């Protein structure tokens, strides 16, 4: 345990230095975020902010590819992170759009297929200590839903300073506590990912000096999805990723009603933009979403332990 804490402490300052260099490098090259005209007008001032701070999450995972216990989550983090990185590069070139949504989902499907090949196959699905079902078909469906949904959901959540990073941090603290008893390489990787997130939030807190980019959102999504599979808490992920689910549902509802009734349910989706346009300050939206995320996670854990 002491080794994990010491390593994380040293790593925090290393990550701060890496991010500071990355910010300065992008500024010197004129690299920065392009803000789409369709977004809230208050976001126009963020134009030019350095991007792809989430590369640091890939740096964390690369060494852990060489350990049996951490190969699967590391591979998941890196593959989804590379998908996000490709999207970021396309956004830099095309300005107004990156990888098209359907193509992004298709690529997520291909990555998930590769991950399924490399994963251990325990077809049991639990809620707490209760076995819900043991079925290869249901497990495969759940596996694909988790890996396609979570990275894309975190990507949708990444729209305000500190929002995706902070909510992911809350979720990862659950997995750290859940795995701390084992005191193995996976525990160390989770601890270092949390450390990297804290270092990132040092610069991403409002007003952000750098954004995580799609590389960060997808890497975190791949990591969290893999942890839910490893720890057999796939169903609990609905509560562990509460805000991710809410943000995704808001987009689905908005698109569905617009196509059906030609009207919008929200002023703008994802949901965090709706509250911005309602007059909430960005920091208020972020902190209230943190609270909702934490409450949903605690509520889910209580329900999980009742069985």
Curated annotation (Swiss-Prot):
Membrane topology value: Multi-pass membrane protein
Transmembrane segments: 3-23, 47-67, 71-91, 105-125, 137-157, 162-182, 186-206, 210-230, 237-257, 285-305
Pathway(s) this gene product operates in, as recorded in its UniProt entry: Cell wall biogenesis; peptidoglycan biosynthesis
InterPro entries, per database record: Glycosyl_transferase_4, PNAcMuramoyl-5peptid_Trfase, PNAcMuramoyl-5peptid_Trfase_CS
The UniProt record lists the keyword Ion transport: no
Reactions mediated catalytically: UDP-N-acetyl-alpha-D-muramoyl-L-alanyl-gamma-D-glutamyl-meso-2,6-diaminopimeloyl-D-alanyl-D-alanine + di-trans,octa-cis-undecaprenyl phosphate = di-trans,octa-cis-undecaprenyl diphospho-N-acetyl-alpha-D-muramoyl-L-alanyl-D-glutamyl-meso-2,6-diaminopimeloyl-D-alanyl-D-alanine + UMP
Pfam families listed in its UniProt record: Glycos_transf_4
Subcellular location: Cell inner membrane
Single Gene Ontology MF annotation: phospho-N-acetylmuramoyl-pentapeptide-transferase activity
Name of the top EC class for this enzyme: transferase
Highest taxon listed in the record's lineage: Bacteria
Documented EC number(s): 2.7.8.13
Keywords attached to this entry: Cell cycle, Cell division, Cell inner membrane, Cell membrane, Cell shape, Cell wall biogenesis/degradation, Magnesium, Membrane, Metal-binding, Peptidoglycan synthesis, Transferase, Transmembrane, Transmembrane helix
Cofactors: Mg(2+)
One GO cellular component, as annotated: plasma membrane
GO BP, sorted A to Z: cell division; cell wall macromolecule biosynthetic process; cell wall organization; peptidoglycan biosynthetic process; regulation of cell shape
NCBIfam families: mraY (TIGR00445)
Family: Belongs to the glycosyltransferase 4 family. MraY subfamily.
Role description: Catalyzes the initial step of the lipid cycle reactions in the biosynthesis of the cell wall peptidoglycan: transfers peptidoglycan precursor phospho-MurNAc-pentapeptide from UDP-MurNAc-pentapeptide onto the lipid carrier undecaprenyl phosphate, yielding undecaprenyl-pyrophosphoryl-MurNAc-pentapeptide, known as lipid I.
UniProt protein name: Phospho-N-acetylmuramoyl-pentapeptide-transferase
């Amino acid at each position: 345990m002491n080794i994990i804490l010491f390593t994380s402490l040293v790593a925090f300052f290393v990550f701060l230095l890496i991010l500071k260099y990355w910010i300065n490098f992008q500024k010197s090259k004129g690299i920065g975020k392009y803000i789409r005209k369709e977004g809230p007008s208050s976001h126009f001032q963020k134009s030019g902010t350095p991007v792809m701070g989430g590369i640091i999450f890939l740096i964390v995972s690369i060494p852990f590819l060489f350990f049996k216990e951490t190969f699967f989550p590391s591979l998941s983090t890196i593959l989804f992170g590379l998908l996000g990185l490709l999207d970021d590069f396309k956004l830099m070139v095309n300005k107004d759009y990156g990888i098209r949504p359907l193509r992004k989902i298709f690529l997520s499907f291909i990555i998930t297929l590769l991950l399924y090949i490399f994963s251990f196959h325990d077809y049991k699905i639990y809620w707490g200590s209760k076995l819900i079902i043991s079925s290869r078909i249901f497990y495969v469906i759940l596996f694909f839903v988790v890996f396609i949904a979570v990275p894309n959901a975190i990507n949708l959540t990444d729209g305000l300073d500190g929002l995706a990073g902070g909510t992911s941090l809350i979720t990862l603290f659950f997995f750290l506590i859940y795995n701390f008893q084992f005191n193995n390489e996976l525990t160390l990787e989770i601890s270092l990912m949390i450390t990297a997130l804290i270092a990132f939030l040092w610069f991403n807190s409002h007003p952000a000096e750098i954004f995580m980019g799609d590389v960060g959102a997808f890497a975190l999504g791949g990591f969290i999805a893999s942890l839910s599979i490893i720890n057999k808490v796939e169903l609990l992920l609905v509560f562990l990723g509460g805000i991710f689910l809410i943000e995704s549902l808001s987009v689905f509802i908005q698109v569905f009603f617009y196509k059906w009734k030609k009207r919008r349910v929200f002023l703008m989706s994802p949901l965090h933009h709706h509250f911005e346009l309602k007059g909430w300050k960005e920091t208020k939206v972020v902190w209230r979403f943190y609270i909702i995320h934490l409450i949903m996670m605690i509520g889910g854990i209580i329900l999980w332990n009742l069985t």
